[in-house]
Amino acid sequence: MAFPETITMDMARRRFFLRSGSGFGMAALAGLLADKPANAASATPQPHFTPRAKRVIYLHMIGAPSHLDLFENKPELVKRDGQECPESLLKGRRFAFIGGKMTLAGSRFQFQKKGRSGQELSNLLPHLCTVADEIAIVKTVHTEEINHAPAQMFLHTGFGRGGRPSIGSWLNYGLGSETENLPAYVVLLSGPLGGAGTTLWSSGFLPSVNQGIQFRTSGDPVLFLSNPQGQTREDRTQILQSINQLNSRRLATAGDPEIATRISQYEMAFRMQASVPDLMDISRETPATLASYGAKPGAASFANNCLLARRMIERGVRVVELYDADWDHHNSLERSLPRKAADVDQPMAALVRDLKQRGLLEETLVIWGAEFGRTPLRQGIDGDGKTVNPGRDHHKDAFCFWMAGGGIKGGITLGKTDDFGFAPVENPVHVHDLNATVLHLMGLDHEKLTFKYQGREYRLTDVHGNVVRELLA
């Protein structure tokens, strides 16, 4: 129950806002035209402690690559390729699709030790090998979900169902924005999204200002950002002024923070009409830079997106998330995996190298991974027991991530799995531990970064998670 004084003060406050509504709309617009948002004076959230990283570039491979053919060399698995899997290794394990006879599947690709650190990487990743001393490979990541959409949501939100905020939204909520002319959280796609879809960058129950914004690499970078045909920037200014007046009046009566978000989004969209075309024009890069990434102006590719990610963090975008599709190799792995590895190998290595050369790697955390890994078992066996274009099924119990920059100890391998790659035997890292570590590197305590919703305090790591200190430089 509210006290009488509180009610009186609230009514007076509402009368003030009502009478000043048009003034706020004009003030917002004036600040906008001066390249200063109307809410610029509001307090920016502060980290809990000194951060090791200021920005994140997250490279998510949709569908889950076979870590056993990229990062996990298992000589015993290769030796016993084609043999029936011992029952003891299968006890208590869940698989998404594979059934019947369980046959071990060794990798058909070669591994090499690279760099001063001796990181062991597949020959499918010759470019990544050149930055082996910059990356930390975690070989014992594990999750709770065995299907794509729930596992993708679990990785990004800490929960296998929709409705909760993504890690990018939590970072935006906890740290605020560093830029006035671009969103704090941007998403880029190469290939069809599939899986959990746009829930992966949803703000969930957090204020919608923390939502990720998808940029496109062809056509309008942001849908409906350009002025409609026949409308000038002056026309847009007048429309924005009128909308701001209406929204400001409604904000005064309702006090809904989502209305304030709407006002700021209109302002941001107006500023982005000037800032986004320059950002997305990678033809401004030198020929040498374009060649290093394998980027081609006008193309829609992972290479272009990696280069755009660097351009975005240079301009103050806090979180850039890249989704690359077509990694779900239940069959035809020997043909499909080399093609996909070639798509990402050069640009992601170029990204790490480019960030380092520009002095940005120390304060930019680069993360590569997927929702789960692939089984040490062969999938695609017919009724006669012969393999037909074999692949691998989903595997939640052990898979690989790599990280670089932003407080990460480069050149290390963390964790060890059994001889076949079924499960961790040293240093297991749960997805909650991984997310707790990302927040820690950004200066946030995962146990203190909370939001109260429907009577409960929520956090990204739910009630779990420990910082993986072995990864910290």
Language model features with spans:
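Ligand-binding pockets and gating/stacking loops
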Residues: 1-473
